[in-house]
Amino acid sequence: MPELGKTLITVPDAAGGAEHAVEVWDADSAQFAARLRKMAKERRKWAARAGVFAYRIYDADLPNYALAVDLYREAETGEAAVHVAEYEAPSHIDEAKAARRLEDALAIIPPALGVPEARV
């Protein structure tokens, strides 16, 4: 059962297999999850063709999720790590709401990209 005030969304894993239930504050976070997954798939194909091991997956594509998400992959092992940077929210956005959106994104990123939480 989700924490009070939170809702469950389903996030497919990076390989397109299992779906993961993720607790979020805003049900609209599903839109961020879908965008992140789509961009990761496109960039993963490009990176494989180009022989690139570090690249940006997401760069504030959606106005409510003002983040940059970069993926770094070990050339030898293929093990990945993700760096997330938050852009400053506009002054008209409530700070608590922006913090909840960041929390939602940080919950979505590990299953969506197939990276352990400790590597985000």
Show where each model-derived region lies.
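Non-catalytic substrate-recognition/targeting regions of SAM-dependent transferases
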Residues: 63, 67-73, 98-120
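Glycine/alanine-rich phosphate-binding loops at beta-alpha junctions
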Residues: 89-95, 111
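Non-catalytic accessory regions of SAM-dependent methyltransferases
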Residues: 1-83, 87, 110
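Generic alpha-helical secondary structure signal
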Residues: 30, 34, 96-103
